[in-house]
Each structure stands twice: as C-alpha cells, then as structure tokens.
C-alpha cells in the first residue's frame, strides 16, 4: 500500500463493503505475471507488448505467489473463492505445483472454493470447473475443449469484446443475447460469470449498466426459473433448454424456428 500513489488498501475497502452488504468476496489471481523477472521463461504471451525477458526463477516466483495468496486469505476476512487464470501461458508439461498451492488455500480457509481457468480437465483440489466464453460441452471459441466433469460448473463471458475496459470497444451483446446465454448456462447446470471492465475512474460503463438493468428486469419476472435451479430433465436442444427446482420443470423456448 505504501508503495502505491493511492496510499490506500483498495482490497480492504472492497472486502469490508462486501461483508457489510452480505456479498461473498472472490479474488481473481493470475498465475501469469509479465512484470516479474523471476516469472518462468517459456511463456507464450506478451511478446512485443512490454514483457521483460526475465531470467526465470521458479522457486522464487512460487514463493512470491504463495505469500500473496496467504496475504489475501488472512487479511480480508472470509473469502468465497480464488479464481485462477494464466496457467495456459506455459507449455502443458510445466509443473505449476497446483496441488500444494490448493492445499495451502484450503488450509488457510477450508470453505474457500478453488477454480482454475486453465482450459483443461480439473485437477485434484479444484472445487468447480470453468469454461471460458463457452457453455459446458461446447467449444465455439476454441478455449473449452475439455470434457465436462462432475464438479459444479461455471461459464465466464464478456459483455462486449474485451475483458478489460477499452473505450473503442462498443460491441456490446444485446439484452436478448445476454438473457439467452444466462438461460442456456442454467440449463447446462452452470453458473454464469458475466465480466464488465470498469472505466479508469472506477465507474461501470453506461451501456453495461443498461444491459444489467435489462437482464435484471427479465430476472424480476422469470428469476424463479433460474435461481436455485438445476438443468431439467429435458436435455438441451437448439430450440432451448429446461431447468428444474424441486418437482417443478421450466421449459425455456429460445428459438421457435427449430423443428
């Protein structure tokens, strides 16, 4: 904190407000770090965009990551989940020592969930399986060719084209497209993590807020068919999906043109 121009612990303020509002705090953590010289050599991203050559020192880097994770899991109260990303930067045979890292997390906070956006079959110690820009069992974006496991599922998607904020990116998905994606995720037993990149001043883009309101209006009317449901007994079809809650079955017809 002292080394930053802001001079305040942003995560502490966020954590305090989440706990106050009854929102479970989840942390995104990148295994990939272009800014550290000890990050292992051999990574495939960031070439030509300011990534330092570095010398690579895995022992040092692994200690650095675990020290950061320890700080996150001991300084900010209950943490709902650690959402990992970046494993895909290294060759598939690279040993990230994930089992030991996951054990550290579960030791510090036994109730903290662990997920990893590595685009692979889940590893031991992971509590849910995620799919990037695809629904479970689909691979339209070319990032989710792994098989669907028996773990709880999640799909992550962007509201426009980018994960972070980019002022030129106005290619926002329509409210209808977002609602359909949400419904399809529920029909495939998956949680939906919808990404929004905040503006430099911390505010959410007006278009993103408008989209959230539109989805919220739909959920106000039909939320019982999504919240607390599982995929229904009718398997997903091109025309739509089904969800169920208890002895109630909900049919979501999304495309009447399908025969």
Regions found by a protein language model. Name each.
Residues 1-259:
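Mature catalytic domains of secreted/periplasmic carbohydrate-active enzymes
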